[in-house]
Amino acid sequence: DKLPREGGFLLVCNHLSNIDPVCLLWVMMKADIPVRIMAKSELFKVPLLGGAMRQMKLLPVNRRAKDPGAILASAAQALREGECVAIYPEGTLTLDPDLWPMRIKTGAARLALDTGAAVIPFIHWGEQKIMRSGSALIDFRPRRRVSVRIGDPIPLEDLCRESGSADHEAVEEATKRIQRVMIEEVAALRGEEAPTGVWDRKLKERVDY
């Protein structure tokens, strides 16, 4: 069991399908560890859905805020209070043609450096066979298997300083480490060799880490 039983920690998850959070919630429920999943704040304004998200104690992410600290404030507070927080650092469903994690944003690194929370990879594979990326249709055919791999904490202690996420070089290095480990863990779960480079959603091609 690689999930801590005490203290706040951050799960970094790859994003294949809109039902990924269901898989995450199921695994964490079986582990008897409550999890706060980060979700874009716009969804909280949707009738019925917003109420359900608040009931589930999801954490709103205000992506329009100009201050990066304000965007992640609720998640940082939850981590400081000893809670488990889950983030999809790609920011959206992967656009990689082969469903590898695409270039991640800096949010996970910022949270880790600002709170000192452990960062643990939560990798899954198979949800895309139940609900394809960008689709709202569920495939109810049997034998749709979802596999989960929980990795070791990503070493970031040497980057944690009093300046936290204000240290831009530390944020960049932490982001690269998280990116690299996520891809390595996906490769291990899929039993495949990872591609060279990472998919950049803007350039629509693979680039160096």
Where are these regions (language model features)?
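A charged, well-structured terminal subsegment
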Residues: 73-81, 146-172, 178
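Catalytic core of membrane glycerolipid acyltransferases/transacylases, capturing the structured
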Residues: 5-65
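Hydrophobic/aromatic ligand-binding patch that stacks against planar heteroaromatic rings
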Residues: 27, 52, 77, 110-114
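Short, highly charged C-terminal tails/helix-capping segments
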Residues: 189-209
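Catalytic-site beta-strand/loop segments enriched in glycine and acidic/polar residues
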Residues: 78-108
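Residue-level preference for the first positions of well-ordered beta-strands
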Residues: 8-10, 84-88, 120
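A cross-family acyltransferase "interaction/gating" segment
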Residues: 3, 98-165
